[in-house]
């Protein structure tokens, strides 16, 4: 793929609660210059990023507890409101493994309602899950209306080819079953073109439409250096 096409899929990420105004300005400047899909920051930084970004750069915000999620819906709602007030049009959040089916669906349904009209990306932390758990988490997220299933936070392991395949297959299964076309966000330790291309090959082997139809995002902080 052309590097410009890869840049157009990139969620350029700065997840540092201590990031300075200059740090955010630098990342937003890179995003504006190179036409990435979005800038991804924490919810409390969305307002600053939005003020500095051009109209073509979308602001995505990680809302709620991170990198570990929670079973308490309330811990997500105020950060979501803060992100939206700051100008975020996309929300990333963690579905914490091990909280149980009932709590998971309560969180997912609640955050979907709170983000109506925005792109919702649900992080399912594939590095600490086996195949059955990855597929189950992806199915729950898709059933609740997630626009993207994101492979991991990157704080508890990286994105593997195996997990990439499992999530891709669940997105395809969801489309075949419901007719709904969801997306996928590859994230976690993606630092160079070789690593990225290996994951893209897996996605393409399962369902090229995820890539060709603009339903793929790449979450990374340093990958941009390999693309510009």
What positions do the PLM features span?
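Short donor-sugar binding/catalytic loops of nucleotide-sugar-dependent glycosyltransferases
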Residues: 190
């Amino acid at each position: 793929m052309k590097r410009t096409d890869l840049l157009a899929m990139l969620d350029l990420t700065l997840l540092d609660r201590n990031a300075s105004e200059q740090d955010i300005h630098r990342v937003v400047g890179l995003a504006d210059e190179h036409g990435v899909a979005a800038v991804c920051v924490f919810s409390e930084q969305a307002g600053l990023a939005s003020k500095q970004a051009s109209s073509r750069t979308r602001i995505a915000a990680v809302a709620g507890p991170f990198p570990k999620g929670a079973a308490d819906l309330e811990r997500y709602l105020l950060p979501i409101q803060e992100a939206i007030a700051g100008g975020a049009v996309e929300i990333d959040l963690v579905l914490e493994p091990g909280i149980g089916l009932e709590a998971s669906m309560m969180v997912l349904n609640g955050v979907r309602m709170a983000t109506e009209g925005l792109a919702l990306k649900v992080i399912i932390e594939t590095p600490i899950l086996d195949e059955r758990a990855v597929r189950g988490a992806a199915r729950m997220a898709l059933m609740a209306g997630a626009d993207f299933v994101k492979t991991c936070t990157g704080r508890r392991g990286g994105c593997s080819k195996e997990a990439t395949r499992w999530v891709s297959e669940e997105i395809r299964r969801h489309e075949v079953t419901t007719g709904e076309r969801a997306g996928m966000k590859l994230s976690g330790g993606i630092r160079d073109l070789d690593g990225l291309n290996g994951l893209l090959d897996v996605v393409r082997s399962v369902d090229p439409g995820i890539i060709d139809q603009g339903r793929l995002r790449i979450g990374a902080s340093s990958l941009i250096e390999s693309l510009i």
